[in-house]
Amino acid sequence: MDKPLNMALVGASGVVGQKILQLLQKKDIKIDNLFPLGKSTVGQTISFQNKDYIIGDLDSFDPKEANITIFSAGGSVAKKHAKKFVESGSYVIDLSSEFRYEDDIPLIIPEINGDILENLKEPTLIANPNCSTSQLLMVLKPIHERYGIEFLNIATYQAVSGTGKEAVEELRSQTYDNDSIESKVYPKPIAFNVIPQCDIFLDNAFTKEEMKLVWETKKILDPKIDVQATCARVPVFNGHSEAVFLKISNKASREDIIEAVQGTEGVSVMDNPDSLEYPTPYEQANDSEDVYVGRIRSQDIQGLSLIHI
């Protein structure tokens, strides 16, 4: 008889925490006991599977109550608490960047390297890649397997939902009241603008978000791939977009790439120039978990270009 699924969700009231609960409910995954946890939100009520839950205090919660725990409350919270949950017998999935680059902690995209999970013998801390990396590698894995990717140049156009509730509200308020714009979340106004900065700048003049794409692509897909990235924040509520140029080892046509990507779990191809069929955040990002890819083009230099949402 399977063990009951007792899940703790740290950051349950946030944008990501709420999305996790929506996905669990949509996929009809039965949670026997849910423990929503937080710090500043203790005492608030959330709803899940037709039941109301009171958010509990993370600091006083007994980790032994949970056999799986999801952290969606940022790196500092995960750093303080995640390993204590593992030591108490819980499998832990951390959505922050806190543990992604530690050699002994698996960085998992289930559709790509989920087989690693099958070999786990005991409760483990599992890192979740950056959202931009996950959608990128979902598309690139079948291409790399068939044709070998040597070089990537990525430009991201990232929605404000990736920053959190405050960013969503900032875009909404600036859009409605453009005369008195006040920026608290971002360094520049986000409404009617494009901000060529996601996360902090590092010593090499790249932002941390850009380097996440580099580090995580190499760790998950192939350390030999040369990766260049530019990340921008755009005035879109939901749905990150990425324009990708890749150089491959073996020449492939546009049709070859479409064939390679089609049928990949979690990926949908939308690419018909004649009927103006291509993905957009507005149409595809709100009601689906799939990655949508289009505008696929092949170049004579064994290069490919595409856009995905």
Model-derived features: positions:
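Short amphipathic alpha-helices in soluble, non-transmembrane regions
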Residues: 256-264
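Noncatalytic modules at the cell exterior or secretory-pathway interfaces
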Residues: 303-305
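Oxyanion-binding "anion nests"
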Residues: 194-237
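Conserved small/polar residues in nucleotide/adenosyl-binding loops
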Residues: 307-309
